[in-house]
Every structure is written in C-alpha cells, then in structure tokens.
Amino acid sequence: MKYLLLIFANEETKEILDRDRDKIWAEVDELMAELTESGEWVSGHGLGSPDQARRVRVQASVPVVTDGPFAEAKEHIAGYCVVDCASVERATEIAARWPDARLGGMEVWPMLG
C-alpha cells in the first residue's frame, strides 16, 4: 500500500537545516538509496517556502485566494515522500528514520486508490 509521509518545518527547523544541511542530506540520500533498493521508494519532493504558497477556497462560487505565509500557522508542510510498503507500521518506521522526524515532525497518511 502507498503512504504519504508529510514533512513539517518551522523557523527552528530552518535554522537547524541551514547549520547541518550536509549531514542531514547525507542521511536522506542513504535512506532513499535503501528504499529504492527495497522497492519501497515511489517519489518525494521538497516544497517552496510559505511565502510562495496560496490557499484557495471557493465561497458562493467565487475563488477566494489568500497568499502565504499564513499567520495562524506555526509550522508548514516542507515536503513529502511517497512510499509503497506492506503496512502502516513499516511506513511509520520509515518516517521515524527520516531526519525531519527529529526536526519539525512527520505525518503518515494512507493513500486511497
């Protein structure tokens, strides 16, 4: 089954990433290589900064667009991974090994279809 692993960040995680970028990316590269070899890696991408985001909602058939950053948000989605593995426990294990789980945190979501 496929699972979406959402990566969260905040101002503190940005500072840590700026400081330890090479070490963190080396961990990511190693884990991605392992998941590729096992056939569990599907895809993943980092996302732009919150000031590049837009929220779109339709009210009375009219799109209402709000530019980021969103004041009410203390954290934001910084990226995602898609893995294809046997169970939610395995997906959770993968998320727990991802460096971002120690920083802003991660969520594991089953994908439908």
Regions found by a protein language model. Give the residues of each.
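Conserved, structured core segments of small domains
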Residues: 1-113
